[in-house]
Amino acid sequence: MPTNENNKQLAIGWREWAALPLLGIPAIKIKVDTGAKTSALHTYKMETFNRSGMDYIRFWIHPLQRRKDIEIACEAQVLDRRVVRDSGGHAEERYVISTPIRIGPHEWEIELTLTSREDMLFRMLLGRRAIVGGDFLVDPKASYLHGKRPRKAYPSRKKKHKGISK
């Protein structure tokens, strides 16, 4: 869990930019969802494999909404498989991994379930298990208290220039 040198609660907004450094994800927009027990990361393709007798998963994500040109392949050791119910009560078995998350200067280990969130606005939900015990204060009126997306995290879209006709 993040440490706070002044022993004060760490304020986070209902949405923040985060990094998942060990997964090679420099920036991803997250929704802090205290109503969700587990954290979830959007993946659009997954495959499991075995490495030295351990179960691993390789998965691909589009970390930015509406930017399918940006694709990141990730690998992590499988921690567990769990049945998770979504807000509509639908049950789904999901792979669970453990990885550090960074929000602003604070970094700590969290568990993430992997699922398809293609139609969702946020590519990642940060559930209450990830923030319990960390002395967080979620401000439901605030957004991006720890900064906007770093400009150089991903390439910008190339602007289409109109050609000069002769």
Label every PLM stretch briefly:
Residues 1-166:
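Pepsin/retropepsin-fold aspartyl endopeptidases
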